[in-house]
Every structure is written in C-alpha cells, then in structure tokens.
Amino acid sequence: TLKKMYEMYPDDYDITLAMSAQHMKKAEKLMELGLYAEALPHVLFVSQKHVDDNEVNGAAWEKALSCYINMKRYNEALATLDTITLHFPDYENGTLKRAFILDKMDKTEEALQLYLSAIEQSDEDMRIFYVIGYEELAVPYIKKCMEAGATKKAYEESVKLISLNPSSDLGLRYAINSSGLLGKYDEFEKYTAQGINYYPEEPFYQAKRATVLERDKR
C-alpha cells in the first residue's frame, strides 16, 4: 500500500506527493462533515512536507486556515494567513480573512483600520468589495458602541462609514441618532437631508425631518 511505501521511502518525492493527495482527500471529506479538528492533522501533514508544488501547498494552507477559523483558534489562523501571504503575495482574500479573524478576536477597530488602508490602496473594483466588507463589520460595532453608551464613538464610526458609502442606510440612521444624542444639530440636519435624498419614502427619515422642521420653527 501507499502508506507502507511511504514508510519505506519517506523522501521519495512522487510517493510523498501521492500521500499528500490522499491526505487532502481525507481532509476535504472531514471538512464537509464539519469535523475540522479531525481534518487538521491531514492538512498539516501536507503543509509540513513542504512539497515543492505551490498549488498543493497553497491548498493545504488554505484548508488549515479554514480549520483554525472554524475551531476558533484565531492566533494560529493569523499565523497561517501570514504564511499564505508570504508565499502568495497576490493572495486576494488576505485582507478579508484577516479582518474577519481580528473581528472575531474582539479587535474590530484593528480590522476596520485594515479595511481603510486596503480601500486607500485599491482600484475601483476592489474598493467596492472592501467597502462592503468594512460596512459588514462597522454596523454591528456601531450598534455595540450605542448599546454601551459610547455615543461619541458610535457617531465617529458612523460618520466614517458614511464617508465610504454615502447611501448606507444603517450608517445614516446611526449618524442621525448619535448626533441627536450628542446635541450636534447641524450634523443631525445634514444626515437627515442625506437620508431623505437616498430614501425619500422611508418613515424614519421623514420623522427625523419633521423634528428638524419643528426645531427650525422655534
């Protein structure tokens, strides 16, 4: 069998490659079943063999990353991601994956910062991609700030979000609510007008506009 041959000739390249393929197949099956802890040793066998084949290595590291994330072993996930980006500088998912992991580690501000620098350096196509990613993390973070009574922080973060995506419905709502609580009436008015502009039929913005008009009468 292949296993016996591998035990006899552990340095034979073709046998190692065949063994690696077998381990990858096993890992795939286990991962499909959600058995990430069981899949991990199979994946690590491949990545630790340093097979002189970038495709094989890349696939093994990708799977290891997925296992670590699903097992909530985030430090190891970050280390694996570092390995991937070192060997594959053009790895496109790097920013998204890193931001996702940082957010899971309660380092959301760091994750948002990562997106901001990616947005600054990206072309138009990738920019949209990163802005969507940014918004996905920013909205729950702003909500968390609001609930914790960190209104100023919530306001700052929602303004950042709107500057990236001016039509962000939730971004605008949080900016309006937080500016109102902070007594920033000019901003309250500005973001209400922006909301009405994008969502003229939306009752939330109409109600806020009524508040603005009421205040102007006084």
Functional labels for PLM-detected ranges:
Residues M5, V46, H50, T83-I84, ...:
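Canonical positions in the second alpha-helix
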Residues A21, K25, E32, N70, ...:
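Register position in tetratricopeptide repeats
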Residues D14-A18, M24-K25, N57-K63, N93-K97, ...:
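Alpha-solenoid helical repeat scaffolds
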